[in-house]
């Protein structure tokens, strides 16, 4: 089941095990059970620390990752390959006794949860943001015996996942808990546990504090650290929106990579320098005083710095039409790579004729029954090579000069209405899912009245990446820089860093 290269990598990782692990498998006579049995046997053959026993569990096929004679609460229902294979390997290492790479303060928060908490996460194996949630809840299960977690592959357990329209979908004790990417800190916050503000209030002032974790932030942090400046990053997650990007083929010198790989490499590069990286928390306010620039965090802690670089990126732009908000995660989606498999053999729409929209339509055409692409303009805006590929597909329709007006459906999406801009006629297309790909909205709601924003909510900067407030700089997709590309954001981050350094020298 595992190819030679993957086996070699796995062999090296399993050598890091620090104790014994027992797979407790619930298997039937079906094909998926046979596939799971083959996978578990292959892994057991690679390490003397792994044994397999069979036992009836809640779902078949499934298996728990336990210590001999001790249940950890970690279960995989289905076959955790694809993006979830890393989740399985990490669970094995942590259950074996390998210390988690998590801050002690977070570990203490997890230990302090009283519970019991029984989590279930529905995933698709092509979902790039699902492993973050699975790995976070698995870690919590390893640390706290009052927590259990089951990963459920929706493609295997279709009856259970029939009404799941977006992944990851997390349930706590049978009730919906959350959708989309969540960090350990996000989960802890939803459970009522917050980071101690004193952990942040006791920090010495920075020379440069970078707010955000994407490509611009990473670039800025590395450049300022190399200048010998005391540098800090405060961010929800390293990689930012790039984490949700499937393929990256235009980052020069790297022919092809994925968003998750890029983000992982960025985090590793940042870790090579003396940079105080604070993740899992967001900024809520910024103000300049006579002595310093003060950044307030969501736990009310305050960080001080001589300069600040704002690089909080952007989020998916919504259609803002009736029915959309009500049916998000119920047929309205934003990530085709994550949620596409949930619409296998169904009819879907993609809204947006730029590169992202056309790429989404191409990817979805290989999974779903039919794709209808809507573009407001009179022609598509995507690169010609993508348009040619799209038009060659037999199960794709393209509607230009189409203004979407309403998402239709009661409990779930059943259609979309649009106006033909050439005729003025209103029409309805019956379908099961809608993927919105119409660009991004800058994450600047926390900056109102702090720095100058344009009519689109973007931070206005000059050629030095400086804002209208001395000492506050900005870079990346959060700014009014016209073109939004990873490579451009990284250059902007470096430019902001060098000009922040120059500002410190002169002030």
Curated annotation (Swiss-Prot):
Annotated residues for binding of FAD: 207-222, 467-477
Coiled coil: none
Cofactor(s) needed for function: FAD
EC number of the protein: 1.8.1.-
Keyword tags: Disulfide bond, FAD, Flavoprotein, NAD, NADP, Oxidoreductase, Redox-active center
Alphabetized InterPro entries for the sequence: AhpF_NTD_C (IPR044141), AhpF_NTD_N (IPR044142), Alkyl_hydroperoxide_Rdtase_suF (IPR012081), FAD/NAD-bd_sf (IPR036188), FAD/NAD-binding_dom (IPR023753), Ferredoxin-NADP_redctase_2 (IPR050097), Pyr_nucl-diS_OxRdtase_2_AS (IPR008255), Thioredoxin-like_fold (IPR012336)
One matching Pfam family: Pyr_redox_2
Enzyme class, broadest EC rank: oxidoreductase
Keyword Manganese: no
Source taxon at top rank: Bacteria
Bound cofactor: record note: Binds 1 FAD per subunit.
One example GO MF annotation: NAD binding
Disulfide pairings: 335-338
Signal peptide: none
Residues the record lists as binding NAD(+): 347-361
GO process annotations (BP): response to reactive oxygen species
Family membership noted in the UniProt record: Belongs to the class-II pyridine nucleotide-disulfide oxidoreductase family.
Other information: The active site is a redox-active disulfide bond.
Task of the protein: Serves to protect the cell against DNA damage by alkyl hydroperoxides. It can use either NADH or NADPH as electron donor for direct reduction of redox dyes or of alkyl hydroperoxides when combined with the AhpC protein.
Subunit structure: Homodimer.
Name of protein: Alkyl hydroperoxide reductase subunit F
Species of provenance: Staphylococcus epidermidis (strain ATCC 35984 / DSM 28319 / BCRC 17069 / CCUG 31568 / BM 3577 / RP62A)
Gene designation: ahpF
